[in-house]
Amino acid sequence: MNVSKKNKKRIIDEARLRARGSIPRVVAIGMNGFSDAVLEFAVARLNTFRAVRFRMRETSPVSHDKAAECVQNAFGSNYAILHIDDRDFILFERSMLQ
């Protein structure tokens, strides 16, 4: 997904401002999902905020792209993924692009 520089900065700022503690560590389970604790954390955050940042563990058995795809699929088409670097990505509401 192409995101303008302005929107990218806004999404990153939203996720950073809302972090309040540690970034959840994404623990992949197989190729299709993540620990319930990580998803529950994200659901709780998304009830209040519009962006949640995730960080891949170095030992994760799946690729960064596959992990981001799984997270996005878990939340549906109203959300998109913004890749920050090779370990971090942000799940955000598509409405932030408008």
Question: For each predicted feature, which ranges?
Answer:
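Positively charged, polar, low-complexity stretches
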Residues: 1-98
